């Protein structure tokens, strides 16, 4: 089924007769508060009566003060907090019919027939059972004279929508569950911190991470920190695993590596079903290798801390979509889970997802390991393949001849053009190792176009890129210089090094440069090689992709800074902060940071604003302050307007807010480029580069003659690899020209603009802002392949 994005008109107050409740159940995860906030505020916008059910199903059974009406202020200043403000508990009573009968009565007395369930597969299964029994529960309540027949008729259908909150990412049907990205942040922060002490003392660290039945955290954490060995439930090693582990670690030490990291998921076991614990691994290393091995059990640290920007935005989108799904539900509607498919919020039948999730557990219990990995989805499968390849010490012998030359080896080059961005080094490492694994030779071009012309080119070996994944910046060096006017010198260098395929990693400049080189193919035969671009810039302003490498790290930096800036006004007086973000003419950072930071407004170039809009926002801020809100946050993209500068907006708010609030201005600058790349950027760089190696090899193979001369003339041999909707896509550069605004260096169409109405709905106080209605995009269910 092809996906369709339907625009629907949602009028303010259009659902006045409906009652909706939101609750969190099971284990907590970071981002749940953002989901609760989005559900509540979207429901208030639509005119519903909204309730919190505190302490999960237990609160539903107990009733009384556990079910409280929520208002706009109930969910203020919670988006940045971990855990769940409404509490979560495991509930034995709800498992019994008598408990569910009490819960049904408590809901009916308050007119609640719409439930948003935020939890894991157990919580969602319980909610579905409750929905199926609803009619018989009501019959019993009427029979007991607990409710009237009028109430039974009025509330005869219960609608439920699920949101999956779980740090394990163990739910089939969604690419990411709420909390997983933040848990990965905690794991990577811990490993990055431990690496320095391990390096100092030549230690082996064994890190135990959560994941009793799912190895996602261990697997992706291992990819993001270059772990030497991982143990996960879906890929149990053979009983001789101690031999393989020791052989791998010993080889790495002899190759000069000072630190080793082994990650163990808490549910790890061998093929016979015997558990493998961190203690077992330490014992093996101590006895056989005599290494100084230490154990770190992360435990509940992974559940804690502030949610990442990704989890906040995911929860905002899912929470709003859950409310809309409930409002549109009919008595015949199948209950759905709001899932993430690639970069799209979709609705997926709840029980299909639950059954598939349970099928994974069944496959593992029956020792059908390959089936278990397959059921986890393509994303998990590819992560596993990538991990296995990248952690080999040496490329496989069968890909090389007796002289050590690659049997089907080509000569590839990689370079950066543009500003540095986090994730570039991870992409280079992956590109180098994937290519060498195949038998290719890889050249690293230092300092972009200028370095190429100067001959600053060297062959990169397998161990040259060790330890690159977790490092920010660009180790190869990068400059913004474009090739225009220097084609002759560039062609001469490509000829000198016999380059047969080129990868360019960088921002808008890399896309522009690749296009310029491809345009000169008729004049310079050396340019008739396959060329591919990986977009890498915090601005996220490159056409042909929805995310560029580095923008997640930039977004997290801004979100974290906004949290700190806002906290600086805690306990003092009413204050508004005006913050300027980077991004050139692209408003991605300002908009998404606004959504993740709970900003009141975000001014960007793509959405024109007038003095009237600014005035309206000042009045809105004043009315919020008058009703007890103590802090306001305004974001402005650096090139949002030539005349309405950050200073102008700051002065306007300062003048108009006299007597009500004070105003402060912050220009964030280069700290937004980030320190250490986020797990998202590390893994995106790793996967994208792996795909580029396969693509370059396929293009060279199809266009090479007997003498080894590559002749690529067709437009589809110069491409940009991007994430588009649900999958990775290689887009010919010539096709992207029509989609590009070269003057402002931005794409003409940008997916995130459809999130701006959501930003305004979640920021506007009911009494402060009256509008007839608002267009917001409702994204429908889709069953195509997810981004893998």
Swiss-Prot record:
List positions binding substrate: 166-168, 203, 210-212, 266, 294, 300-303
Q: Does the keyword rRNA-binding apply?
A: no
**In which tissues or organs does this protein occur?**
Nearly 90% of the PFK activity in adults is localized to the thorax.
Keywords in alphabetical order: Allosteric enzyme, ATP-binding, Cytoplasm, Glycolysis, Kinase, Magnesium, Metal-binding, Nucleotide-binding, Transferase
Region of interest (C-terminal regulatory PFK domain 2), ranges: 411-788
Q: Which cofactor does it need?
A: Mg(2+)
Amino-acid positions noted as binding beta-D-fructose 2,6-bisphosphate in the UniProt annotation, renumbered to this chain: 480, 537-541, 575, 582-584, 638, 664, 670-673, 745
Sorted alphabetically, the Gene Ontology cellular component annotations on this record are: 6-phosphofructokinase complex; cytosol; mitochondrion
Gene Ontology terms: biological process:
canonical glycolysis; fructose 1,6-bisphosphate metabolic process; fructose 6-phosphate metabolic process; glucose homeostasis; glycolytic process; response to sucrose
Q: Does the keyword ATP-binding apply?
A: yes
UniProt record similarity statement: Belongs to the phosphofructokinase type A (PFKA) family. ATP-dependent PFK group I subfamily. Eukaryotic two domain clade 'E' sub-subfamily.
**Protein name, per record:** ATP-dependent 6-phosphofructokinase
Native organism = Drosophila melanogaster (Fruit fly)
């Amino acid at each position: 089924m092809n996906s369709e994005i339907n625009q629907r008109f949602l009028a303010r107050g259009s659902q006045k007769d409906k009652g909706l409740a939101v609750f969190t159940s099971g284990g907590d995860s970071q981002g749940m508060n953002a989901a609760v906030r989005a559900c509540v505020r979207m429901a208030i916008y639509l005119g519903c009566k909204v309730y919190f059910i505190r302490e999960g199903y237990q609160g539903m059974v107990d009733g009384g003060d556990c079910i409280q009406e929520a208002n706009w202020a109930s969910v203020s200043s919670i988006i940045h907090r971990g855990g769940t403000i409404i509490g979560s508990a495991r509930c034995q009573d709800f498992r019994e019919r008598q408990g569910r009968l009490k819960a049904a009565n408590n809901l009916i007395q308050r007119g609640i027939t719409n439930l948003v369930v935020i939890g894991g597969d157990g919580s969602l299964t319980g909610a579905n059972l409750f929905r199926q029994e609803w009619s018989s529960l009501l019959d019993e309540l009427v029979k007991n004279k607990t409710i009237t027949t009028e109430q039974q008729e009025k509330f005869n259908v219960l609608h439920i929508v699920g949101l999956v909150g779980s740090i394990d990412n163990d739910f089939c049907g969604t690419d990411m569950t709420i909390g997983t990205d933040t848990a990965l942040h905690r794991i990577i922060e811990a490993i990055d911190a431990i690496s320095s002490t391990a390096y100092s003392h030549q230690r082996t660290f064994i890190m135990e991470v959560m994941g009793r039945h799912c190895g996602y955290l261990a697997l992706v954490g291992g990819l993001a920190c270059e772990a030497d060995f991982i143990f996960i439930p879906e890929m149990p090693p053979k009983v001789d695993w101690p031999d393989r582990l020791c052989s791998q670690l010993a080889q790495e030490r002899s190759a000069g590596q000072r630190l080793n990291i082994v990650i163990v998921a808490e549910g790890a076991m061998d093929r016979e079903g015997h558990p493998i614990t961190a203690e077992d691994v330490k014992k093996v290393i101590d006895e056989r290798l005599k290494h100084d091995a230490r154990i770190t059990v992360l435990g509940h640290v992974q559940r804690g801390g502030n949610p990442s920007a990704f989890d906040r935005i995911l929860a905002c989108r899912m929470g709003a979509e859950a409310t809309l799904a409930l409002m549109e539900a009919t008595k015949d509607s199948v209950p759905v889970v709001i899932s993430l498919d690639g970069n799209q919020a979709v609705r997926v039948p709840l029980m299909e997802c639950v059954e598939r999730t349970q099928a994974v557990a069944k496959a593992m219990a029956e020792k059908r390991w390959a089936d278990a990995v397959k059921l986890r989805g393509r994303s998990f499968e590819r992560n596993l393949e990538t991990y296995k390849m990248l952690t080999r010490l040496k490329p496989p012998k069968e890909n090389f001849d007796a002289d050590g030359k690659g049997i089907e080896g080509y000569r590839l080059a990689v370079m950066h053009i543009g500003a540095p961005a986090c994730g570039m080094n991870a992409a280079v490492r992956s590109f180098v190792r994937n290519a060498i694994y195949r038998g290719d030779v890889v050249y690293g071009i230092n300092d972009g176009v200028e370095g190429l012309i100067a001959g600053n080119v060297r062959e990169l070996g397998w161990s040259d890129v060790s330890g690159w994944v977790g490092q920010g910046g660009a180790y190869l060096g990068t400059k913004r210089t474009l090739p225009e006017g220097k084609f002759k010198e560039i062609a001469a260098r490509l000829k000198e090094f016999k380059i047969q395929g080129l990868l360019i990693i960088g921002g808008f400049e890399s896309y522009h440069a690749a296009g310029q080189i491809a345009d000169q193919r008729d004049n310079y035969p050396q340019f008739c090689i396959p060329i591919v671009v990986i977009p890498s810039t915090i601005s996220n302003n490159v056409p042909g992709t929805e995310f560029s490498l580095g923008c997640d790290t930039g977004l997290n930096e801004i979100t974290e800074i906004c949290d700190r800036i806002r906290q600086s006004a805690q306990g003092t007086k009413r204050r508004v902060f005006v913050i300027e973000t980077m991004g050139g003419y692209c408003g991605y950072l300002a908009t998404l940071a606004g959504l993740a930071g709970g900003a009141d407004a975000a001014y960007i170039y793509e959405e024109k604003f007038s003095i009237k809009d600014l005035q309206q926002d000042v009045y809105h801020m004043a009315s919020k302050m008058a009703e007890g809100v103590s802090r306001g946050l305004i974001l402005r993209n650096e090139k949002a307007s030539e005349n309405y500068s950050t200073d102008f907006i700051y002065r306007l708010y300062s003048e108009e807010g006299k007597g009500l609030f004070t105003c402060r201005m912050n220009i964030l600058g280069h700290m937004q480029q980030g320190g250490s790349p986020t797990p998202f950027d590390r893994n995106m760089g790793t996967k994208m580069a792996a795909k580029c190696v396969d693509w370059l090899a396929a293009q060279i193979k199809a266009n090479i003659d007997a003498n080894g001369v590559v002749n690529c003339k067709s437009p589809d041999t110069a491409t940009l690899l991007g994430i588009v909707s649900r999958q990775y896509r290689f887009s010919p550069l010539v096709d992207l020209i029509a989609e590009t605004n070269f003057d402002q260096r931005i794409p003409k169409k940008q997916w995130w603009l459809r999130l701006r109405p959501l930003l305004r709905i979640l920021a506007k106080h009911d009494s402060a802002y009256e509008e007839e209605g608002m267009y917001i995009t409702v994204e429908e269910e889709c069953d195509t392949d997810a981004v893998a």
